[in-house]
Regions:
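Structural and coupling elements of P-loop NTPases
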Residues: 1-690
Length: 690
């Protein structure tokens, strides 16, 4: 593959619902352009794109893959992204480097949740978008039904540019709306424009009017011409369509069948005709380390900025960093600087990646995508620059992992391998997080969902030889008291020689203003010498680490040393510490201790039609609805819910909302646990200690 510069490169993110055929569309392009000698299939393990063992096992994309296609003396870097929602981190990284979007739609179910999410994301990022309705050669599919569903859901910007010609239930060709010509797939008619079938002329005229109207909306001169009934010239129409597609005002619809290579050539032609090259983007904004915004040309003449959007950590090869050159030229055998941390990086070699294959390259020009190996100080979202010209690209925003599971090694031999594997996988995946909880003594791993963590567990085993077991993480309950009580503690021990003696009276009272135990003293007349006050406080703090009900930490308690006795010879710090323990034990029988549970602030965003179901489910979780705010066609629900009832919420919310609901949560406070839940927690705690 030759070098391509910014005016020859297009970067297209391929997005859509899982199973719509995104990878198959790209496999068909590879095969059609003779980049491969066979049509690869994930399920057979022959795919050039989905080649990882996890992808073969599941039969779907798990990772983002770069698929460069050479077509019409240009290079299209397709970024194949997973459609399954658990792998959204891979999708977000891949989507960020695409300058345009190709949404692949399943003709049998055109409005799947992944299609809606893909379009929503493309609109939010203002990226030119094309729809490809796939699998139209399968039974019970209809182009018209699929197109109408898309137009009704997403608006008048969705317009067909080609319509399939169907004879006896089979797609035999297509009609190009703008050119008003038909093309047939039979060998004798291939690449020969033909008249539009008479039965389709009315339909084609209607679609051409839709295109003309959309073009007119973006140009005052053409609008006047449109409403006066004049037809646009071919040049006016093509120019208007290009502008409309690039502004997001027109979303062309194409169709076909990836597995039978129907419509694939026409789709590549459409992408070349209407999607912008990287240089046509014009400018992009970078930021200096001091926070100053700088406008840069998307050109090879500009200073170098190259952003890492994906990292792979291999136990044998090391770190592989996928980069997009946003400006300037990245050269092999050069030294650059990481603008995010100021550290130098040696660029030993650059690779052009095509699925599972890599080819060495001397340079990577503006707009192009490649891979670097063994960078020492660089991670995903970092920007590589020329020395002395440090500029950072806007960071890619990744979802926060919410689904947590405690992880333990299966055997002692797995401990070191597990620790190493978790550290490496965090470098690789921005949506994977590891938290060591000192209170529960658990290591908790967080991901987007259960399938995400399933992939993590399999990678720990296959890549790092660490077998693990997952379980629900323990909830960090708390205990407190609801009544003021005085406890007496008298520690006396005589065993020959010096004995041990300490005697204290301690008041325990609720103190909602301070989480940690507060210690005070009101001792009069030297009943307890001051030198023993720290020992009493230490003893009380030790006791508060384990509450009387279930052994959870005591909070919101004020302790006051009131009185006591000492012995000139037998008293010691240890004796008074033990006396404090006994006073605590005595007081807890009278202070009415209760169990507290963590309450989470939860912010949920769902389409309107799911609001009722989500609120009903929150009520079942003992949640309180704090408010609702309309956001576009969604509702944002603010709620407070006990943490104990949120352990699998990411999976269950996805099920309730067909994948369209999202949420975030953070700790707010501790509240009393009502019965009978408190008794269950206390009973379970006792069983764990047996």
């Amino acid at each position: 593959m030759r070098d391509y510069q910014s005016f020859e490169v297009r970067n297209v993110s391929v997005i859509g619902h899982s199973g719509a055929g995104k990878t198959s569309v790209l496999e068909a392009m590879l095969y059609y352009t003779k980049a491969t000698d066979r049509f690869g299939k994930t399920t057979e393990g022959s795919s050039m794109i989905d080649f990882d063992t996890e992808e073969i096992r599941r039969g779907l994309s798990v990772y983002t893959t770069i698929v460069p296609i050479e077509w019409e003396d240009s290079k299209i870097n397709f970024i194949d992204t997973p459609g399954y929602l658990d792998f959204v981190g891979e999708k977000q990284g891949g989507f960020s480097v695409g300058d345009s979007s190709l949404i692949v739609v399943n003709a049998k179910d055109p409005l799947q949740s992944g299609t809606k999410l893909a379009y929503k994301q493309a609109v939010a990022e203002k990226k030119p978008t094309i729809f490809f309705i796939n699998k139209l050669d399968e039974e019970h599919t209809s182009f018209d039904a699929s197109y109408q569903a898309l137009r009704e859901e997403f608006g008048k910007s969705v317009i067909p540019f080609e319509v399939p010609i169907v004879e006896d239930g089979k797609i035999v060709g297509s009609v190009n709306i703008i050119k008003n010509k038909a093309w047939y797939y039979s060998p004798e008619l291939a690449d020969k424009p033909c008249p539009v079938p008479e039965s389709m002329q009315e339909e084609v005229a209607l679609y051409k009017d839709q295109i003309a109207e959309a073009v007119a909306m973006g140009d005052d001169e053409l609008m006047e011409k449109f409403f006066s009934g004049e037809e646009f010239s071919d040049a006016e129409l093509k120019r208007g369509v290009r502008i409309g597609v690039r502004n997001g005002e027109i979303c062309p619809v194409y169709s076909g069948s990836a597995v039978n290579s129907i419509g694939i050539q026409r789709l590549m032609d459409l992408i070349i005709s209407y999607f912008p090259t990287y240089s046509e983007r014009g400018m992009y904004t970078a930021t200096t380390p001091n926070g100053v915004k700088v406008e840069l040309l998307t050109s090879e003449t500009e200073v170098l900025t190259a952003q890492v959007f994906k990292t792979i950590v291999d136990p044998f090869v090391g770190r592989i960093s996928y980069v997009k050159v946003l400006s300037g030229v990245l050269a092999a055998d050069s030294t650059v600087v990481n603008a995010n941390n100021g550290k130098p990086e040696k660029i030993s070699q650059i690779y052009i990646v095509k699925g599972k294959h890599q080819t060495a390259a001397g340079k990577l020009f503006t707009g192009d995508i490649g891979a670097l190996v063994k960078l020492q100080n660089t991670k995903t979202n970092d920007t590589l620059c020329d020395k002395g010209k440090l500029l950072m690209a806007d960071p890619i925003v990744f979802d926060t992992p919410m689904y947590g599971q405690a992880v333990v090694p299966k055997t002692k031999n797995d401990e070191d391998r597990l620790s190493n594997g978790l550290a490496r996988l965090q470098e690789e995946d921005p949506t994977f997080k590891v938290v060591n909880n000192p209170e529960t003594k658990e290591t908790v791993i967080y991901g987007i969902g259960d399938q995400h963590l399933d992939v993590i567990v399999n990678k720990l085993n296959s890549k790092f030889k660490a077998e693990v077991v997952l379980s629900d993480p323990k909830i960090t309950y708390r205990e407190t008291i609801t009544k003021t009580a005085v406890g007496e503690g008298r520690h006396k021990k005589q065993s020959g020689g010096h004995g041990q003696f300490g005697h204290v009276f301690v008041e325990f009272s609720p103190n909602p203003d301070e989480e940690e135990m507060v210690f005070a003293e009101k001792v009069f007349g030297g009943a307890v010498p001051k030198q023993y006050f720290p020992a009493v406080e230490t003893g009380l703090r030790e006791c508060c680490q384990k509450g009387p009900l279930a052994g959870y930490k005591m909070v919101n308690v004020k302790t006051t040393l009131l009185d006591g006795k000492y012995h000139d010879v037998d008293s010691s710090e240890m004796a008074f510490k033990m006396a404090a323990h006994l006073a605590y034990k005595d007081a807890m029988t009278k202070a009415r201790p209760i169990l507290l549970e963590p309450i989470m602030n939860v912010k949920i965003r769902v389409p309107d039609e799911f609001t009722g179901a989500v609120i009903g489910d929150l009520n079942k979780r003992r949640g309180s609805i704090m408010g609702m705010t309309p956001v576009d066609s969604d509702q944002e629900i603010d709620a407070q819910v006990p943490m104990a009832n949120m352990s699998r919420y990411c999976v269950e919310l996805r099920s309730m909302t067909t994948g369209l609901g999202t949420y975030t949560m953070e700790m707010d406070r501790y509240d009393p646990v009502p019965e009978p839940y408190a008794s269950r927690v206390i009973e379970d705690s006792k069983k764990d200690k047996e």
